[in-house]
Structures are given as C-alpha cells and as structure tokens.
Amino acid sequence: KVRMFHNIYIKNNFFFKKKTYSMNGEDIYIEKTFKKKAGFYVDVGAYHPLELNNTYLLYKKKWNGINIDISSLSIDYFNFLRPDDININVGVSNKNRVKTLYYQKNKSPLNTLNFKQAKKIFSKKFKKKKIKTKTLTNIIDNTKYNGKKIDFLNIDAEGNDFEVLKSLNLNKYKPKLICIELVDHFNPNKKTVKRHKIYKYLIKRNYKLVWSGHFSHMFRR
C-alpha cells in the first residue's frame, strides 16, 4: 500500500502536473473567486486526494481543511498524500444515526447512502452494510475548526447531497461558496435547476447560483 501511495504522489507531483484537478474545471473558478493565500475548506464525499478533486489546487496553495469520505481506503490515501488536512472516515446524514451503505467496491466515487441512487447506478449488483453517520455540524464541531467560518464547502454525496447540506448549521459556519451536485440532472437547463430542492433551499438562505457544470453547481453568498 505504501508503494502504491508513493507512486501516485510521484506521478502527480513530478510527471503530470496539471492546471486543474476537478472534473469540469471547478477548482479554477474556485481559486479565482477567493484570490487568497490561505483558507478553510470542507469536502464531503472527497473520494481521492488528487484526482477529480475540487480542493487539491487549494491545498497546493496552502489552504487546509476537512476531507470526509465513507471509504476507509480513500481516507488512507488522504492521510498519506494530504497530511496537513483533517481526514475523516464517516458517513454524513441529517441525524447522528446508523444507515445502510450501498457499494460495489470499497473505494469508489459511486458508493452511496441513498437506496434509489444505488438502484439507478448499480442496478441490483451491489453490497450493503450498516455504518454510523453524523451530521456535518457535529463532525466539524469536534475538530480544531469548531466555529470557524467555511470559505469553500464541497458536497459530492451521490444522491445524499441535500441531506448532507441540511445537516450543516449555515448560521454557524456560513460557507462563502458551496459546490454541490444535482445528481439527478445531467447538464440541466436553468429552469430545471431552479425547480430543484437544493436550489430553492440555498436561494432562501441568501445564496446565488454563480456557476454550473455537468453535475456540479456553485452557490455564493
């Protein structure tokens, strides 16, 4: 495992340096939005510390934060490749409770706590296990970042995104920029986005839609 992590680190930092590490260039927009030397991010459904990641470009610029994923192997990657962050292996939901995880492989960006999403993506070919989940507020409260305002919040929870969002006390942590997936719509038009429950939830809380990609959308306050 150590050799595997080492090879990934060498490849990404010395041979294949990139301008963007996100799926659709989200990190370029995020970097331009803040233009600051250091900041605080929270990434839920972080999956991989370098690949398809919206916070690695910020990490390289001396930002730090919290990475959360339901895969213990993903968090092993983060602990090795991003040791300056707090990396937590836990599920996130709107209550501290036990929920069912639906998965095919231990490390996959498609693992989900949402049964409908699992049926849609995996058909009937998936495994199940019970895991403990916590609210996002509870998770942050129990770190050194308790009470610290979030500069950038990233949520990629495979159909569980709204539940994760609702589990954060926005009045306490006040994220300036939120990137979140509307996984049931690929490349949606503006009317479709505006009908989505996540859009309505954030607009009511004084956020404005400022960027849209194939799945991800960014809201700023």
Residue ranges and their predicted role:
Residues K1-R221:
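Phosphate/nucleotide-binding beta-alpha loop and adjacent structural elements of enzyme active sites
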